[in-house]
C-alpha cells in the first residue's frame, strides 16, 4: 500500500502537467477514460458484487441502490465523462481586462486550483464524475471513498488510470487513498501544502467533521433538508405531481424533499389525496409506501406517526416524509429559515406576489416556484456532471461545475512602468 504522504508527493509532482494542459489534450484523456471505464465493466461489476455482499443487511435498501452498479449504470458514468468533453474549457478564460492611466494592462484570468481532495461516501458514480470534472478544470485529484464502496471505487480508478496511460497526461493526476480509516480522512483535512481544496460529499456527520477539523480550504456540500410549501393559492394537481416527484423519484439524494408544509386552507383537500397517492396507490403498485411524520394539525387529515421535533431537522434519505400544516406563507418561510440546510426549497402557488415573497425571503442555494426540487443538479442546470451542491456562499453556491473548481489570477502587462 502506498502511504498517504507518498500519494500527496506523487500528485504534487505531476500536477503541473494537468494544470497547464491544453483543452485538446484534456479532452483526449477524458475520452480514453470513458472508453476504458466501459471496457472494464466486467471487473467493475465483480468488485461491486463484493461490496454489495458485504454491505447487505448493514445499510438500507435505498443506500444499497446508491452502491449498486450494472452495465447500464457504468455506461451512464462513461456518458457523463463524455459530456464533460463537450463543455467549454474554463482554464485561460479572460474574466476582465482593464487599462490603467499609466498604461498597465490588467487581465483577470481563470486558472486551476491545483490539487483537489474529495472525501465521499458509498456512491461509485462520484468517482468518475470527480475525476472528469477535476481533469477538465485542470486539477489533479485525491479521492477517498467510503469503506462500503472501496472495491468498486478501486476498480473504477484502475480503469480511469489505464485510460490516462494511453495519453500524455500522467495517471498520477488521479490518486485513490487506499486506507479507508478515519485517520486517512483526517490526514486529508490537515494536508495543507498538498491539497489546495477539500470537498466532502456525504451525510451530515462527514460534512461536519470536515468543516470543523480541516485546515485545508473547504467547500461545504451541505445535507438536504429540502422543503416544499403548498400555498393557499396552489394548483392541487400541480402540487401533487411536484410532491410525488420530489419525494419518490429518488429519495436517497440530497435534492429529494424531506419536509412538506401545507397551508391550512389546503390541508383538508390535499392531504387525503396525498395519502392516496403516496401510500395506497404505491402499495397497490407493489412500491414502498411513504411513511408520514405528522404534526398535530396534519394528523387530522391523514394517518401516520406523530412527528417528533427532530423529524423536521432530519435528512431521511428514505421513504419518510415530515408534514406540517402552517397558517400562512410567513409561517412557512419562518419554518424553512429555522430548519433548512439552505440547499433547495420550493413553493407551489398561482399567486405571483406569494412566489416573489418566497424567492426573496428563502435563503437557499436553489429556490423553486412550481417545480420539483429534484432539478438541483449540475446536469439539469446545464453544467454537466457536478462535484456536489454547495450550500455555502463563499466561492461557490449551488451545483458545482467546472468553473466552480477554478480560481483566477491577475496578469499585469507593462512597458517598463515603475511605481512612484
UniProtKB/Swiss-Prot annotation:
Its EC number is 1.2.1.41. Disulfide bonds: none annotated. GO terms for molecular function: glutamate-5-semialdehyde dehydrogenase activity; NADP binding. Its main location: cytoplasm. It is an enzyme of class 1 (oxidoreductase). GO terms for cellular component: cytoplasm. Catalyzes the NADPH-dependent reduction of L-glutamate 5-phosphate into L-glutamate 5-semialdehyde and phosphate. The product spontaneously undergoes cyclization to form 1-pyrroline-5-carboxylate. This is Gamma-glutamyl phosphate reductase. It comes from Streptococcus pneumoniae (strain P1031). The gene is proA.
